[in-house]
Amino acid sequence: MTAKSRFEFKPDYAIAPGVTLQETIDSLGISQAELAKRTGRPLKTIRELVNGKAAITAETALQLERVLGVPASFWNNLERNYREARWR
């Protein structure tokens, strides 16, 4: 067993990407309305993302990367892992 595999975090639960999105914008001092403005997405869409009613698409992930500085791959992986966990 390698040190990496010994200490790798593998939770048995999934956190909705919207929770992480809200935590991220909170930490940056950005409101949902400001995020909507900066991404060019309707506020309704941002609210749906945060509330887990809408999925983070590849396009949305790129917009979040541009505005928040968090790589699109992070958002894409978070969304994929969450959806996979919900189906298990």
Functional labels for PLM-detected ranges:
Residues 2-30:
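A short, Lys/Arg-rich alpha-helix, primarily the initiator
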Residues 22, 33, 62:
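Residues within the helices of the helix-turn-helix
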Residues 27, 38, 67:
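Residues within the alpha-helical elements of helix-turn-helix
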Residues 39-65:
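Recognition helix of helix-turn-helix/homeodomain-like DNA-binding domains
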